[in-house]
Structures are given as C-alpha cells and as structure tokens.
C-alpha cells in the first residue's frame, strides 16, 4: 500500500531530525514551517539570532542591532514579499532597521544581501504616498524586486 519511496524517506529521516534539532537550538520550532530550514541557514551564515514571536523584527546581531529578514525562491517569483497590511506604522518600523535578503534557487542559497534603511527609502516613500492617496487603505504585500536588491544592496554572501 505504501509508496516505494517510503523506505528512502525513512532512511533520510534521522538526518532530517538532526536538522530540526539544530533549528530548535536556534529558536526555530519547525524547519518545514515559515521557511524555517532556510531561516536557520541564513542565521548561521550571518551570525544573527532569531527574535521570538511573530511581531516586531526577525533577528538581532551580537551588538543588539535588529534586522528584518526576507528570503525568496527565484525559481518561483522575482519580488520579495513585505507585509500584508502595509501602512505608515509598519513603514516607520521598517525605516529603523537594516534588511537581510536571502536569494534561493529552490532550496539552494545563491546570495545574501544587506540593505540599509536609506537603500529602501525609495519603496518606503512610494508605499506611504500610495497609502495616503488611496484613502488610508493598507497595501497588500507590496514587493521589492530581486533586481533592486542586487543593484542597491551589499552582497554579504
């Protein structure tokens, strides 16, 4: 009744569990949820620590600087997701921290870029103007193009 590949999965499972155990050590509860496996890789490469909870920034460095983290699979899309309810309150929060953008092809990491708040001001200003001109209506997940990140960011990996 089971699929022929079940034995292969069972053979791999101890290694997957080991990966999950490493993720738990770094505050990631599930490598299969919310890009947990990719998040672990980005944290280990950058030396950042995950910030718990769904609100606020995503990670912090040893000096206490917080960061917003984004990842993308460029086989599927060309723009980084931002926030499903973009508004001036969220934009003000985003203006306070650098962003780390991880670019993947499938599950293979290709590059990581860092953008400072000033590097993203073009988008902050554009979103803010749109929010006001649309009658204070939140913007649903505006994207930041991969091309923009690569042209304006500092490649750190």
Swiss-Prot record:
Mg(2+) 1 binds at residues 58, 68. It comes from the Bacteria. Its EC number is 3.1.21.4. Its cofactor is Mg(2+). GO terms for molecular function: DNA binding; metal ion binding; type II site-specific deoxyribonuclease activity. InterPro entries: PvuII_sf, Restrct_endonuc-II-like, Restrct_endonuc_II_PvuII. This is Type II restriction enzyme PvuII. It catalyses: Endonucleolytic cleavage of DNA to give specific double-stranded fragments with terminal 5'-phosphates. CDD domains: PvuII-like. Coiled coil: none annotated. Keywords: DNA-binding, Endonuclease, Hydrolase, Magnesium, Metal-binding, Nuclease, Restriction system. GO terms for biological process: DNA restriction-modification system. It is an enzyme of class 3 (hydrolase). It comes from Proteus hauseri. The keyword Acyltransferase does not apply. Gene3D superfamilies: PVUII Endonuclease, subunit A (3.40.210.10). Binds 2 magnesium ions per subunit. Mg(2+) 2 binds at residue 58. Homodimer.
